[in-house]
Regions:
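Ligand-binding clefts of soluble mixed alpha/beta catalytic domains
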Residues: 1-518
């Protein structure tokens, strides 16, 4: 028995040594080897159960003394930020991470275990894809199960976090595209359906790797990447931080709450952050920093749809997702917010909306980019969210932005206003300019332009809108649940979250009738 165990250990060591032989090449590129990445990802001292380590042995090379097992993958179960996860890493130290014989079978088995055991799924991707010299049509067809499984995991509520350390090409690009969260490494990520050689052969187009599928492009333009890292080490740190927010939903409920911490930034500053006149821009991250535990905010997709701010934090120790605005919502911002809302619903994370929104972007370019379609998707996500939603109207709440940011009509569990809140279908100046333009055009058609009447109309419309939009009018009409001191925002949200949480946990005994007086 011991001799057989020694043989198993020797084969496992052979795979490690084969990958380690590429160390100098990886270090020259500023990269970590796959097993070093795995070591940094896992909690220190926690157990790691490696799976299917002998996959492909004697199938990639009939000589048992030369065959390297593993199938081109490293896989196993371990803890990341206190959450037990399934981890799958491309062993890119061997044959550039190309799948080896039985690698597909190993991959499918790893996914099967994750699905059956509801394990959060982390992928460390850097693979040249399938080895075309060993192409088999049956493996191509069966390989579709990989992508179907990723879709089923996400639908089931299993979070999928992917780091693209290098290439993620052709069908393998859908490993990235079907992930819930994607972290990309600047200068190393390559995610595209066709690389430069195939692109030129197929269409004649000439493009670089970076133009086609680089991290900067995907995090700023396509939106495929959510977080941008400068190197492997930072990417792994981001994955750990992300798992701390999205992973506990599938762990034991007692592990969800963290130790509450006061914000590092002083909440007393809140009175001077939001301009009363509504004309001075406000960076809503400054508000977030004075609400959340430790002023710690993990922003998602900060380079894509940048006016819309989405990210994870904790309030009084409980995880929350926060959405706010640093400008109008454009198509990219709406798509990002939709993805974020759905991700929070998947992980059971309550949503907090900090409204400071002048509306959705308008104009020919934005119409061509599908602002109506993407805005509608955001509204769909808000209306059908399955988690508690709490809205704070901090500043402007204009037009469809009120709807997309979970205004009163969308039934948030609680909605509070700051004294600086302003609610209207549009700003008074905008409404006045619009109506004067329409009226003036009608006068031109009749050949009689009355400038004094237009000026009087302009002033009257501004006055009408201004009188209706302030917090004293809206709160008087019960369009919120109260006006709060901005400095108490954190405490108000914490209490509202607790009310929602306890209400959901409370066991009720419904009857067909109410209790009647004797």
């Amino acid at each position: 028995m011991e001799s057989l165990l020694d043989r198993v250990s020797a084969l496992q060591a052979r795979a490690r040594d084969a990958s380690n032989a590429a160390r100098a090449r990886f270090e020259k590129r500023g990269q970590l080897l796959p097993r070093d990445r795995l070591g940094l990802l896992l909690d220190r001292g926690a157990p790691f159960l490696e799976l299917c380590s002998l996959a492909g042995y004697r199938l990639n090379n009939l000589d048992p003394e030369k065959s390297v097992p593993g199938g081109g993958l490293i896989a196993g179960i371990g803890e990341v930020s206190g959450v037990r996860c399934m981890i799958l890493a491309s062993d890119s130290g061997i044959a550039a991470g190309a799948l080896q014989p039985m690698g597909l079978n190993k991959h499918l088995r790893i996914q099967e275990i994750a699905l059956r055991c509801n394990l959060p799924y982390i992928q460390l991707v850097e693979s040249a894809g399938a080895n075309l010299m060993n192409y088999r049509v049956e493996e191509f067809v069966t390989g579709g199960q990989l992508f179907a499984n990723l879709a089923r995991m996400s639908a089931r509520g299993i979070p999928i976090v992917t780091i693209t350390h290098g290439s993620s090409t052709a069908g393998g690009a859908y490993q990235t595209g079907l992930s819930d969260f994607v972290i990309m490494v600047r200068g190393r990520t390559r995610a595209y359906l066709a690389g430069p050689p195939l692109l030129k052969a197929a269409t004649g187009e000439v493009a670089t790797d970076e133009e086609l599928g680089g991290a900067d492009m995907h995090t700023a333009i396509s939106g495929l990447g959510d977080l941008l890292a400068k190197d492997d080490r930072e990417a792994i740190g981001l994955a750990r931080a992300l798992m701390a927010h999205v992973g506990p939903a599938v762990a034991l409920p007692s592990s969800v709450r963290k130790t509450p911490q006061p914000p590092h930034c002083d909440p007393e500053d809140m009175l001077g952050i939001m301009a009363i006149d509504g004309r001075t821009p406000t960076d809503m991250r400054e508000v977030i920093a004075r609400i959340v535990d430790g002023s710690d905010f993990l922003e998602i997709g900060d380079r894509y749809g940048a006016f819309t701010v989405c990210g994870y934090a904790s309030i009084d120790g409980w995880p929350v997702g926060i959405i706010t605005n640093n400008g109008p919502i454009d198509a990219d911002g709406a798509a990002k917010a939709t993805h974020f809302i759905q991700s929070c619903c998947q992980s059971g994370t309550p949503l907090v909306y900090l409204q400071n929104i002048t509306g959705y972007m308008v104009g020919r370019l934005h119409e061509e980019r599908g602002i109506i379609k993407h805005g509608a998707k955001m509204i769909q996500a808000v209306a059908n969210a399955s988690v508690p939603q709490i809205t704070i109207q901090c500043g402007a709440s204009f037009g469809a932005g009120n709807y997309g940011m979970c205004g009163r009509g969308f039934g948030p569990h609680f909605l509070f206003s700051w004294p600086s809140a302003r609610t209207a279908v549009m700003g008074g100046q905008q409404a006045a300019d619009t109506m004067v333009h329409v009226t003036e055009a009608a006068m031109v058609r009749k050949g009689n332009i009355d400038k004094q009447k237009l000026e009087e109309m302009h002033g009257a419309i501004i006055d009408m809108f201004d009188r209706q939009m302030d917090v004293f009018t809206t709160s008087a009409h019960v369009l919120d649940d109260g006006v709060i001191d901005p400095r108490q925002t954190r405490d108000v949200i914490a209490l509202a979250l607790d009310v929602c949480r306890v209400g959901k946990q409370r066991a009720m005994q419904p009857m067909q009738f109410g209790v009647a007086r004797p």
